[in-house]
Amino acid sequence: MADAIPKNGDFGSFMLQKISELERKSGIRLELAQKTLLVDNCTTEQVLSVLTGSTVRVNVLEQSENETTISRESVILGDTDRVLIRAYSKIFVCNLPRKIVYRIRQKQLGIGTIIANSQLETFRKIIEIGYDPVRRSVFRRYQIIYRMNVAFEIREELTGI
């Protein structure tokens, strides 16, 4: 889904077309919850809570850092500890306020919760939606933009939703 949304186009119609293409090419039929998560550009944790009707939590499995980026692998778990989403994040520390980077380094909260709690004004740009036949999961890749710079690049695999 690397195509750009037409300037005078409708994001909803564009995403419907991309989801139809994904279903056709991969031979799968997506549930409404999966479609919602693929196109959503709000906080994934909040949307998952609404869709599942329960509290979800983020568990950071692995996190490493170099001078310019933090790489993170995490899962979002439902109330029965079932993995709903597996996320791989690349965080560009030079494009974020220090307090945000500090909270990320603590590994206690999900990125969406950190952004929401800090009232950081961001924009999410969906770069790709697809299907991984090996893992048998639908995924999306998106960027979170802060002050016109890419602050996060995230790939989410919808494993249990």
Language-model-detected regions and their locations in the chain:
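N-terminal domain-onset segments
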Residues: 1-132, 138, 146-161
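Conserved catalytic block of serine-dependent lipid acyl chemistry
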Residues: 143
